[in-house]
């Protein structure tokens, strides 16, 4: 495994006392993001509702990198709680707080408490492309087959 990429991070006042995001296993791809909501003010996410959950983090990604905010599989499987705009993209030039847009697709209300792991963040290199207008594109066996064209 190569040396880790350094990412500067700042915790906002409402995240004071919370740990920084961390990997939960030696081979984990994502850092777990933590809810930075008030200790005495848990967020109740009713069934079918969505909410923006603050993390209290501001990061400075190196040029040529992005962060993706993705669901935690356990929250989705057990409670139907997932990241609505998955994956959420954090660009290298963004300097605002990272918030997580959660939605409760389950049938019961879900309570989010301060310090709870709510999503995961993956940092990855970005490939930039240059689009070139073309009069025709090369044919492929698949052609224009879209949704469901390769099976169930």
From Swiss-Prot:
Listed EC numbers? 3.6.1.23
Which cofactors are named for this entry?
A: Mg(2+)
Asked whether the UniProt record includes DNA-binding among its keywords, one would answer no
Highest rank taxon of the organism: Bacteria
Q: Which residues cross the membrane?
A: none
Reaction(s) catalysed by this chain, per the record, are: dUTP + H2O = dUMP + diphosphate + H(+)
The alphabetized list of GO BP terms reads: dUMP biosynthetic process; dUTP catabolic process
Q: Which family does it belong to?
A: Belongs to the dUTPase family.
Full protein name: Deoxyuridine 5'-triphosphate nucleotidohydrolase
Protein species of origin: Nitrobacter winogradskyi (strain ATCC 25391 / DSM 10237 / CIP 104748 / NCIMB 11846 / Nb-255)
